[in-house]
């Protein structure tokens, strides 16, 4: 006997009771003397059983089913021996679905239903309606009067209610029926019949992915579209029966006083339904009576109780809108108030049940509006925002497990296909299809998508839907989340249920995971395949299948992708990719991917133009296109920069070698591999090789330009914090001043002595002030400095100062010469006596001035003074000299504090430009930079004599010290810190976008979106970015009022 029957181990059972259960069924024996009836048939049964997704589950359910059948189990026994098709269907079903197995055990006499083919639409209607004894409903005379909800408006046309209802006496069609039974009895009948029909569909579907081999015969695979269409038909039939029960409940005696049509939306509307899915509906009625509203509500209640969630949230105004509207009311809403997403939702609508002529009228009136949606002014912004929302609400830990919402998931395909339908369906009626697969096929046939790309996407989409279906069937619950990698048993079950087999090379799970990874990759690249590749192919006239995107269609597509000037974008594409050169061919290969990345930036048009300029600038650099081709991260980062920051784009175009640094090094991004100290030394050393100051400054400018490009790129790519950006910008300025000062001294000595190594008349130190002194410069900051000199031995103070003034003035003039680079303005406004004071003073002169005449504002300015260039020893002595001035041993007097507050009041009242918005002025606005910095400086003046570590010029470092010593509450320190960082990042972002310093945040619109993008936000979230800025600075102003002014009010009298 053992020679005929396979062993338990070979069959793959793991349950300890498996052998006993198989013996009880008469299919197995571990006793050689025991004869199993028809052993060859028993072997076939055993092999078929072991091929299920979970043989133990299937066996356990069969035991329960046989027990439930009692004396009639022999019929099932005989059928399993003689009917291989039944074996495959039953075993596949029981091994894949606990819930449907339980249904079969609860209704054991329905097993012969599995011997029948998948139910037809007409059969499902007959069975569902027959289960509640339905018959055609009759309508009252009042229901024949259409109710024009906007009878006096341009939208009023009423509805023709003279057409017969589509309900049929043979119960095979949708329509308005009346059930014979209601209440719990009806609901039990509906549930049972629905599950039995679902069971037949699932059995046929699962049998199609049953693994066939030498031991097992399978059945032909049921096409995905056939399954989803059958599930949608079942939903139609089920809800038609639910409506019949609702009619009997709401109108128990009389005739129906309304014509109610139910419109299917979403996947049900598109006839691509899942096993378990919400069914979205919209109601239209003529007239809308109180009972019509009750009828719709009862319809939803019964559907939810018996089948699945019935959701009417896609109706006008969503859950806040009325449940039932007239046709006029629907039309009026969509003409006046509907948003873009609502027209996108209407892509999938169709009349489902109820009074079908009214449903058809609904479609005829609203469908044309769908195809005009792409002409709406807000279409592009809305579409891009909807696309970004796909991933937003998915928890990070689930993104790789999500079949629907994760990256490379089902929603990506559905969204992309719908967008192409909206863009091109206005002029091409062949694209006006409901289902995703039909739409993709239409796009392929219409030449909008290449045949190979389209077929690849269809395969990937259907595979993900297959996995989704198998996951849902297990417990007949809504889910689209893959099991975690650690749940090997669940993954093995899913792989087998989906038809994967273990081979010598890989397990079924490994095979499934590999195909899932490949499918996700195909889908994640779909925007290139569906949107950008056809554009490039139309430009370079590549023949891919039947691809024939016309210039007009290409421009439509570009506009939908966010390009404001599609004509210009097409010109750029022609310039880059047209022609037969090797470079053009590589560009044609790269651009679909690059353009997809550009579409996520604030200004795709500007980004594409910048890329064209950069390609021209790098034309002779053979590494450029090769690097973009071989290192994907370089291209992605480059597009983010080019599309978000004109300032950085210009810098990179003038220094293309920076692109080499956009890749990753061994341990970190290449942009971060060079230290600030090395940058400073290289700028100074390179300039020092040239005696001509113009050449030396030009060299320093060139290296500064490259370094600014590097810093700005790292900033835009979120590789640097605000504090790191400011520090690096400050060090670059320090290096340029050092290089410029040395160049002028060399030139002066060569001119006067002929020897650049001779002893100069004086030593010069450059003292950084303001944000330069605190190493907190922004992109648009000037260099606030003071010059101090000390005569060389034998040189008078007057001669030394005169010579130093000549050197410093010459350096300032040379640095300030107009050029294509960001400006190099050296500002002396914080020196003693301000702009009317001497350009250069000796150390003793500074000391005498500050001790005799220094005003409070001048002493306050010294809080941020630090040595940055020139003679280091002289600079250190200057700082030593001012130490007791800016940090008095006994602290500052109340008089000084009052004076500081008086000056701040003047700044608040007088310095803000006319017409400026105080709420969004990043420098002088409420809670912005000036507020925070003055508050920190006042606290420093008041407490520096107590805490030595407050003796530093940095605002952020001082805040850390203030928090460390609990000068004010930590919460308040954090509020001030975040306000300073937020305002500084905003100021930097404005320069990155505008190319110059602007203190005011732009108003809502493209400029604000660009600033938000440069500040690390999604451009589409510009309003949230603005709200965040206002919230942070508003909180900071409250702290400033309390800490700086010592009051709760922002009104000050000083």
From Swiss-Prot:
Keywords of the record: ATP-binding, Magnesium, Multifunctional enzyme, Nucleotide-binding, Nucleotidyltransferase, Transferase
Biased composition (Polar residues): 138-150, 165-175
Gene Ontology biological-process annotations: regulation of glutamine family amino acid metabolic process
Xref: Pfam families: GlnD_UR_UTase (PF08335), GlnE (PF03710)
Catalysed reactions listed for this entry: [glutamine synthetase]-O(4)-(5'-adenylyl)-L-tyrosine + phosphate = [glutamine synthetase]-L-tyrosine + ADP; [glutamine synthetase]-L-tyrosine + ATP = [glutamine synthetase]-O(4)-(5'-adenylyl)-L-tyrosine + diphosphate
InterPro entries: GlnE, GlnE_rpt_dom, NT_sf, PII_UdlTrfase/GS_AdlTrfase
Root EC class: transferase
Record's keyword annotation contains Magnesium: yes
Cofactor: Mg(2+)
Residues covered by region (Disordered): 138-175
One GO molecular-function entry: [glutamate-ammonia-ligase] adenylyltransferase activity
Source superkingdom: Bacteria
GO cellular component: cytosol
Keyword NADP attributed: no
Biological role stated in the UniProt entry: Involved in the regulation of glutamine synthetase GlnA, a key enzyme in the process to assimilate ammonia. When cellular nitrogen levels are high, the C-terminal adenylyl transferase (AT) inactivates GlnA by covalent transfer of an adenylyl group from ATP to specific tyrosine residue of GlnA, thus reducing its activity. Conversely, when nitrogen levels are low, the N-terminal adenylyl removase (AR) activates GlnA by removing the adenylyl group by phosphorolysis, increasing its activity.
PANTHER family given in the database record: BIFUNCTIONAL GLUTAMINE SYNTHETASE ADENYLYLTRANSFERASE_ADENYLYL-REMOVING ENZYME, GLUTAMINE SYNTHETASE ADENYLYLTRANSFERASE
Family assignment from sequence similarity: Belongs to the GlnE family.
Name assigned to this protein: Bifunctional glutamine synthetase adenylyltransferase/adenylyl-removing enzyme
Organism: Corynebacterium diphtheriae (strain ATCC 700971 / NCTC 13129 / Biotype gravis)
Gene that this polypeptide is encoded by: glnE
């Amino acid at each position: 006997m053992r020679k005929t029957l396979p062993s338990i181990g070979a069959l793959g059972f793991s349950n300890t009771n498996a052998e006993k259960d198989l013996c009880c069924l008469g299919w197995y024996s571990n006793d050689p003397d025991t004869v199993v009836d028809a052993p060859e048939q028993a072997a076939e049964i055993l092999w078929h059983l072991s091929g299920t997704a979970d043989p133990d589950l299937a066996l356990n359910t069969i035991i329960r089913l046989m027990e439930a059948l009692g004396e009639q189990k022999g019929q099932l026994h005989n059928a399993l021996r003689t009917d291989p098709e039944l074996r495959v269907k039953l075993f596949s079903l029981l091994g894949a679905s606990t819930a449907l197995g339980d249904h079969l055990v609860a209704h054991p006499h329905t097993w012969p239903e599995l011997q029948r083919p998948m139910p037809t639409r007409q059969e499902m209607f007959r069975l569902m309606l027959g289960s509640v004894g339905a018959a055609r409903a009759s309508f009252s005379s009042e229901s024949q009067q259409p109710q024009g909800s906007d009878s006096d408006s341009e939208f009023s046309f009423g509805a023709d209610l003279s057409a017969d209802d589509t309900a049929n006496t043979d119960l095979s069609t949708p329509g308005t029926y009346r059930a014979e039974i209601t209440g719990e009895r009806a609901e039990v009948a509906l549930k049972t019949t629905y599950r039995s029909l679902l069971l037949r569909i699932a059995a046929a579907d699962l049998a199609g992915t049953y693994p066939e081999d030498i031991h097992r015969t399978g059945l032909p695979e049921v096409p995905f579209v056939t399954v989803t269409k059958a599930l949608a038909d079942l939903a139609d039939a089920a809800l038609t029966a639910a409506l019949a029960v609702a009619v009997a409940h709401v109108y128990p005696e009389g005739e129906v006083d309304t014509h109610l049509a139910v419109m299917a939306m979403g996947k049900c509307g598109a006839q691509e339904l899942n096993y378990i899915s919400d069914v979205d509906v919209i109601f239209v009625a003529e007239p809308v009576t109180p009972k019509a509203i009750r009828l719709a509500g009862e319809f939803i209640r019964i559907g939810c109780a018996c089948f699945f969630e019935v959701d009417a949230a896609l109706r006008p105004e969503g859950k806040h809108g009325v449940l039932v509207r007239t046709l006029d009311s629907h039309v009026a809403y969509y003409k006046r108030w509907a948003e873009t997403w609502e027209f996108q939702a209407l892509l999938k609508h169709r009349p489902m049940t109820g009074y079908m002529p009214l449903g058809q009228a609904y479609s005829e009136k609203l469908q044309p509006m769908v195809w005009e949606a792409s002409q709406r002014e807000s279409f592009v912004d809305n579409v891009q925002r909807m696309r970004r929302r796909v991933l937003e609400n998915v928890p990070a830990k689930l993104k790789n497990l999500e079949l629907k919402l994760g990256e490379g998931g089902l929603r990506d395909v559905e969204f992309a296909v719908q967008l192409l339908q909206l863009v091109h369906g206005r002029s091409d009626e062949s694209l006006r299809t409901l289902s995703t697969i039909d739409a993709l096929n239409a796009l392929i046939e219409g030449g909008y998508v290449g045949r190979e790309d389209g077929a690849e996407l269809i395969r990937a989409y259907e595979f993900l839907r297959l996995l989704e279906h198998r996951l849902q069937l297990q417990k007949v619950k809504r889910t689209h989340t893959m099991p975690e990698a650690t749940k090997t048993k669940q993954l093995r079950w899913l792989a087998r249920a989906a038809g994967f087999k273990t081979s010598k090379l890989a397990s079924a799970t490994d095979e499934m995971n590999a195909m899932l990874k490949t499918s996700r990759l195909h889908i994640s690249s779909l925007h290139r395949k569906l949107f950008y590749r056809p554009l490039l192919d139309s430009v370079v006239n590549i023949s891919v299948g039947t691809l024939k995107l016309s210039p007009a269609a290409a421009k439509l597509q570009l506009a939908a992708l966010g390009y404001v000037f599609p004509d210009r974008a097409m010109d750029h594409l022609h310039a880059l990719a047209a022609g037969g050169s090797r470079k053009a061919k590589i560009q044609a290969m790269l651009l679909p991917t690059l353009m997809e990345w550009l579409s996520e930036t604030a200004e795709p048009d500007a980004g594409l133009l910048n890329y064209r300029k950069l390609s021209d600038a790098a034309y002779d650099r053979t590494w450029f296109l090769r690097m973009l081709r071989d290192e994907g991260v370089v291209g992605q980062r480059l597009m983010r920069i080019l599309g978000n920051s004109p300032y950085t784009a210009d810098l990179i175009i003038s220094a293309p070698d920076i692109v080499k640094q956009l890749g990753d090094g061994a341990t970190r991004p290449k942009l971060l591999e060079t230290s600030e100290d090395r940058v400073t030394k290289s700028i100074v050393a390179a300039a020092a090789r040239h005696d001509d100051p113009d050449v030396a400054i030009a060299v320093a400018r060139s290296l500064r330009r490259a370094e600014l490009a590097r810093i700005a790129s790292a900033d835009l790519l979120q590789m640097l914090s605000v504090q790191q950006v400011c520090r690096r910008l400050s060090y670059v300025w320090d290096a340029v001043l050092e290089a410029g000062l040395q160049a002028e001294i060399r030139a002066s000595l060569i001119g006067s002595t002929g020897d650049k190594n001779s002893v100069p008349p004086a030593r010069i130190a450059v003292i950084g002030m303001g944000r330069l002194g605190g190493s907190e410069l922004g992109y648009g900051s000037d260099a606030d400095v003071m010059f101090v000199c000390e005569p060389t031995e034998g040189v008078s103070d007057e001669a030394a100062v005169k010579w130093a003034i000549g050197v410093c003035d010459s350096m300032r003039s040379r640095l300030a010469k107009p050029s294509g680079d960001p400006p190099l303005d050296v500002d002396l406004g914080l020196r003693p006596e301000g702009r009317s004071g001497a350009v250069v003073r000796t150390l003793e002169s500074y000391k005498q001035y500050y001790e005799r005449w220094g005003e409070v504002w001048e002493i306050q300015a010294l809080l941020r003074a630090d040595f940055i260039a020139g003679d280091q020893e002289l600079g250190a002595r200057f700082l030593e000299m001012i130490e007791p001035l800016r940090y008095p041993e006994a602290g500052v007097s109340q008089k000084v504090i009052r004076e500081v507050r008086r000056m701040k009041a003047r700044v608040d009242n007088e310095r803000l430009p006319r017409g400026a918005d105080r709420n969004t002025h990043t420098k002088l606005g409420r809670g912005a930079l000036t507020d925070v910095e003055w508050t920190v400086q006042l606290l420093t003046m008041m407490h520096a004599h107590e805490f030595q570590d407050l003796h530093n010029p940095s605002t952020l470092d001082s805040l850390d010290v203030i928090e460390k010593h609990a000068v004010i509450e930590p919460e308040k320190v954090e509020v001030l810190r975040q306000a300073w960082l937020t305002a500084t990042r905003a100021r930097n972002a404005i320069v990155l976008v505008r190319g110059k310093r602007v203190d005011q945040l732009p108003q809502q619109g493209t400029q604000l979106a660009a600033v938000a993008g440069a500040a690390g936000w999604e451009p589409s979230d510009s309003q949230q970015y603005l709200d965040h800025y206002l919230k942070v600075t508003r909180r900071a102003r409250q702290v400033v009022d309390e800490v700086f002014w010592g009051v709760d009010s922002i009104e000050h009298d000083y």
